[in-house]
Amino acid sequence: MLKTLRFGTRAFGQNLNIAKRNFCTRYTNDHEWVTSLGSQNYRLGITDFAQKQLGDIVFVEIPQIGATLSQGQPITVVESVKAASDIYIPMDGSITTVNQELESSPELVNEEPMGDGWIVEYKSSKTDQFQSLMNKAQYDEYIKEH
């Protein structure tokens, strides 16, 4: 009985952690999503709405690790059968990790845009810039209007 309780507590704790992580995702007017990973680290990708608009993704330019960018600068390019689209960094930051899987499997952006299709991770101390982005409800309303 004690082991079951301990397992249940861990499982419950994981569920809370997942919910907390979803709460920390913000969205841009350019249809990018940003998730706070803690310790001033963030993960960036494009939204499901964006990948549907682009169509089949055929290439993702892998940015340079260590590159320092200002809010609003292009961070990479995503190419699809329809168009090439710049992806912008929504906060001042420095790239720490890139999703190398996208070099050989750019379709991950279509298949799991908010999962394995993430593009970069970066470090930023500009939490005010993160907080100024849209939450999920605001973003859902935004895409209805546009």
Curated annotation (Swiss-Prot):
A cellular component term, taken from the record's GO annotations: glycine cleavage complex
Pfam families: GCV_H
GO BP: glycine decarboxylation via glycine cleavage system
Sections of the chain in a coiled coil: none
Keyword terms, alphabetized: Lipoyl, Mitochondrion, Transit peptide
Cofactor note: Binds 1 lipoyl cofactor covalently.
Record bears the keyword Mitochondrion: yes
Family: Belongs to the GcvH family.
Role played: The glycine cleavage system catalyzes the degradation of glycine. The H protein shuttles the methylamine group of glycine from the P protein to the T protein.
Name of the protein in its database record: Probable glycine cleavage system H protein 1, mitochondrial
Provenance organism: Dictyostelium discoideum (Social amoeba)
